[in-house]
Curated annotation (Swiss-Prot):
It is found in: Cell inner membrane. This is Flagellar biosynthetic protein FlhB. Pfam families: Bac_export_2. It is a multi-pass membrane protein. It comes from Helicobacter pylori (strain J99 / ATCC 700824) (Campylobacter pylori J99). Keywords: Bacterial flagellum biogenesis, Bacterial flagellum protein export, Cell inner membrane, Cell membrane, Membrane, Protein transport, Transmembrane, Transmembrane helix, Transport. The gene is flhB. Coiled coil: none annotated.
Length: 358
């Protein structure tokens, strides 16, 4: 039997399970673009500070070399240079780490997945490694990198060719003018490349999300199996509901002998009312239609409960009053008439009991 095609979108449960395993849609092009953007902005922000810092380091080197040129002093000097260079670059390194972290958070939210670091044989299996090397995902990633390099080179060459005509004019400028000319062209080139990398990152993000969705797609059978696991087998749930309805019905039927009257339609509706010292307002203790109405009337006859026909009241009680709830105020008068009928019937029955022995 051929394997069923995966045509269904992944469920929320499958996506959550994939997240717990560290499987999330992630575009390294987005991370790289935001990192590049942050790096360039950091250069503009810290450029003057770097110039001052590296100038001070240069003066310090010349001063130390002029005083002493021993092995120990040179080693100490290089240690100091490494320390000063690290401190100068530290703010940018921190910014790049924060941007890399946030660029991932923006793509797939906060995520803690310990399963990612768990050792798995499949990760070191050379056969799987070869398969992954020639997978569609790797081919697309490689193609995008090649396209990125080609487009960047082509764009740079195109922009540089536009500048060639201005080189003769720029050569006639003074040093300050040449620097300003070079700065404007450099900003133009950088802006163009950033726009290109932004477009490529956006395209890569769409591709990665589509690949992610396709990798998690499910067969129709998998969807059914997952539904059964989450919601339970529909047949079993139906049986449980039937049992619950049956138990509720049996409990309701047990309350009928405690009622004072059953109001009927007469055939389609039956509502049992209870009225005593504990219930100063009549309460609906049982109600039903059709077959259930017949059962209610049958139990009422078995226990000598009065059955009063009132079509309008029976329908209103069934429709508007919940089980074990008191009747609403607007039905007080109609229900009072019913209980008056019940009282009259009981009086007549008592008279018959008295007259009968005579």
């Amino acid at each position: 039997m051929a394997e069923e095609e995966k045509t269904e979108l992944p469920s929320a449960k499958k996506i959550q399970k994939a997240r717990e395993e560290g499987n999330v849609p992630k575009s390294m092009e987005v991370v790289g673009f935001l990192g590049l953007l942050a790096g360039l902005m950091s250069i503009f922000v810290f450029f003057i500070w770097w110039v001052d810092g590296f100038s001070e380091m240069y003066r310090h080197v010349l001063k130390d070399f002029s005083l002493d040129f021993s092995k120990e002093s040179v080693q100490e000097l290089f240690n100091q240079l490494a320390k000063d260079t690290f401190l100068l670059l530290l703010p940018v390194l921190i910014i790049l780490m924060v941007v890399a972290f946030l660029s991932n958070v923006l793509q797939f939210g906060w995520l803690f997945a310990p399963k990612v670091i768990e050792p798995k044989f499949s990760k070191i299996n050379p056969i799987n490694g070869v398969k992954n090397l020639f997978s569609l995902k790797k081919i697309l990633d490689g193609s995008l990198i090649t396209l990125k390099v080609f487009l960047a080179f082509f764009l740079g060459f195109f922009i540089f060719s536009l500048f060639l005509g201005e080189l003769n004019h720029a050569a006639l400028l003074n040093l300050q003018g040449q620097l300003l000319w070079f700065k404007s062209k450099a900003l133009w080139l950088i802006s163009s490349l950033l726009f290109l990398f932004f477009v490529l990152a956006f395209v890569d993000l769409i591709i990665k999300r589509r690949q992610y969705t396709n990798s998690l797609k499910m067969t129709k059978q998998e969807v059914k199996d997952e539904y059964k696991q989450q919601e339970g087998n529909p047949e079993i749930k139906a049986k449980i509901r039937q049992m619950m309805v049956k138990n509720a019905t049996n409990k309701m039927m047990q309350e009928i002998p405690k009622s004072n009257v059953v109001v009927t339609n007469p055939t389609h509706y039956a509502v049992a009312l209870k009225f005593d010292e504990e219930h100063p307002v009549p309460v609906v203790v049982a109600k039903g239609t059709d077959y259930l109405a017949i059962r209610i009337k049958g139990i009422a006859r078995e226990h000598d409960i009065e059955i009063i026909e009132n079509k309008t009241l029976a329908r209103e009680l069934y429709r508007d009053v919940k089980l074990n709830a008191t009747i609403p105020e607007e039905l007080f008068e109609a229900v009072a008439i019913v209980f008056a009928q019940v009282a009259k019937l009981e009086q007549e029955r008592q008279k018959q009991k008295i007259i009968k022995p005579l």
